[in-house]
């Protein structure tokens, strides 16, 4: 049985140049056919399922009005890019003007209310820094305002 089988050399060994000189025409044809199969286009084609396209989250608007009030895109801070900072000032000038107008219109506290708050503040801070014996000299009004009690200094007659 062992004698019936002929040992064959590997394909890689037969492809080497020095081995091809002594090969038969049949084995040469077989090697060429195998090489053609390896190099053919079908060999390099990948049988992968087609990739699904990802859902696009693009929203299309008919009008460009949404883009009108946007700030200028390029930004620079602390003098890093002076040219861009100049452009920022020009492009964002109208937004700053609108913000300044909004700040002047909004008054959180009126002048009268500020004056009342200042009066109460003077009393509370005065009480905070007063000496211990002077703490008793402060009293609260019905509004919760703390005011100092100033006792008039008068001459006391000595009693006989």
From Swiss-Prot:
A matching Pfam family: MPP6
InterPro entries: MPP6 (IPR019324)
Phosphothreonine found at: 147
Gene Ontology biological-process entries: maturation of 5.8S rRNA
GO molecular function per UniProt: RNA binding
GO CC terms in record: cytosol; exosome (RNase complex); nucleolus; nucleoplasm; nucleus
Keywords recorded for this protein, A-Z: Cytoplasm, Isopeptide bond, Nucleus, Phosphoprotein, RNA-binding, rRNA processing, Ubl conjugation
Regions that span the bilayer: none
Entry PTM: Phosphorylated in M (mitotic) phase.
Positions of crosslink type Glycyl lysine isopeptide (Lys-Gly) (interchain with G-Cter in SUMO2): 37, 86, 127, 150, 153
Phosphoserine modifications at: 110
Protein location: Nucleus, Nucleolus; Cytoplasm
Main location: nucleus
Placement of sequence motif Nuclear localization signal: 116-133
Subunit (UniProt): Associates with the RNA exosome complex, mediated by EXOSC3. Interacts with ARHGAP18. Interacts with exosome cofactors EXOSC10 and MTREX.
General function of this protein: RNA-binding protein that associates with the RNA exosome complex. Involved in the 3'-processing of the 7S pre-RNA to the mature 5.8S rRNA and play a role in recruiting the RNA exosome complex to pre-rRNA; this function may include C1D.
Similarity field: Belongs to the MPP6 family.
Name of this protein: M-phase phosphoprotein 6
Gene that produces this protein: MPHOSPH6
């Amino acid at each position: 049985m062992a004698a019936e089988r002929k040992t064959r050399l590997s394909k890689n060994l037969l492809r080497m140049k020095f081995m091809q000189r002594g090969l038969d025409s049949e084995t040469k044809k077989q090697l060429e056919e195998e090489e053609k199969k390896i190099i053919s286009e079908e060999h390099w084609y990948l049988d992968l399922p087609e990739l699904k396209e990802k859902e696009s989250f693009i929203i299309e608007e008919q009008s460009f009005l949404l883009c009108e009030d946007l700030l200028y895109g390029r930004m620079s801070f602390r003098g890093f890019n002076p040219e861009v900072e100049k452009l920022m000032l020009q492009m964002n000038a109208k937004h700053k003007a609108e913000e300044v107008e909004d700040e002047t219109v909004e008054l959180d506290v009126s002048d009268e209310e500020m004056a009342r708050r200042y009066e109460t503040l003077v009393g509370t801070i005065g009480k905070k820094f007063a000496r211990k014996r002077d703490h008793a000299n402060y009293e609260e009004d019905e509004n919760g305002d703390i005011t100092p009690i100033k006792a008039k200094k008068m001459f006391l007659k000595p009693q006989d």
